[in-house]
């Protein structure tokens, strides 16, 4: 009788799934910036400066809400653990923004460009989010949530530019397709954010909080890092209420 042999691709998928599960149980950011600077895309255009709409180009984040507590979230649009965090805690964050409990600052990174078969999905998705931030500042959180509701698998091509534009249209926003087509500077900004996250230090409200971003999601509430499991909604709510 011939023995059944696992296909190498299938084995890799199993190992990846196990690593993700272990990372979530351990409460770590499993989407690690492996390779340091080698994982950082090189910007090919000049990044914008100043502020425009909800985007603080100098601060390297998009702002949502105006509450007294500051929630800083570093994420990569293709990171599956970021998706797990959003699934577990997205409604809590949304509610905290709506009732003016927090100011959410989204810090987009693009190191998983390496995992989208050459399509630079993370960079393109961040550029699309930036288009929304500039043109529709009140819809940043809705578009961010839509990116994760339609999150592609790590290792896939990701969404096309037309699909990224359609996510905005589905929210009732005017077409951002043209903005995405001309998003070279926004892509450069996204890539510069990633480089800065590795060179460090990471500062929040003028004080150092981390040497560098080791992985995503990285979540801080008023400068205090959430170290629980990404899918532990109760622990996240407790930290949010405490600070």
Positions of PLM-derived features:
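Residue-level detector of short, conserved catalytic/binding motifs and their immediate flanks
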Residues: 69, 126, 217
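Active-site-proximal beta-strand/loop segments in catalytic clefts of secreted hydrolases
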Residues: 74-76, 107-110, 147-148, 222-224, ...
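A broad detector of the eukaryotic-type serine/threonine protein kinase catalytic domain
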Residues: 79, 130, 148-152, 173-181
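Polar alpha-helical coiled-coil and adjacent low-complexity
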Residues: 54, 164-166
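Extracytoplasmic thiol/disulfide redox context detector
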Residues: 2-117, 197, 205-206, 239-243
């Amino acid at each position: 009788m011939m023995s059944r042999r696992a296909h190498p691709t299938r084995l890799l998928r199993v190992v990846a799934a196990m690593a993700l599960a272990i990372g979530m149980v351990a409460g770590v950011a499993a989407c690690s910036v492996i390779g340091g600077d080698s994982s950082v895309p090189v910007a090919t255009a000049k990044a914008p400066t100043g502020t425009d709409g909800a985007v603080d180009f100098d601060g390297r984040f998009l702002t949502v809400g105006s509450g007294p507590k500051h929630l800083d979230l570093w994420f990569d649009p293709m990171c599956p653990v970021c998706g797990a965090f959003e699934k577990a805690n997205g409604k809590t964050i949304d509610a905290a923004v709506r009732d003016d409990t927090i100011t959410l600052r989204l810090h987009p990174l693009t190191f998983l460009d390496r995992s989208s078969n050459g399509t630079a999905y993370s960079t393109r998705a961040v550029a699309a989010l930036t288009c929304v931030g500039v043109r529709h500042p009140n819809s940043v959180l809705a578009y961010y949530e839509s990116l994760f509701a339609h999150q592609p698998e790590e290792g896939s091509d990701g969404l096309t530019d037309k699909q990224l534009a359609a996510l905005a249209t589905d929210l009732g926003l005017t077409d951002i397709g043209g903005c995405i087509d001309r998003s070279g500077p926004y892509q450069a900004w996204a890539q510069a954010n990633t480089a800065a996250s590795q060179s460090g230090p990471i500062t929040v409200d003028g004080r150092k909080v981390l040497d560098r971003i080791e992985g995503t999601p990285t979540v801080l509430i008023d400068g205090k890092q959430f170290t629980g499991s990404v899918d532990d909604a109760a622990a996240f709510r407790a930290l949010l209420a405490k600070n």
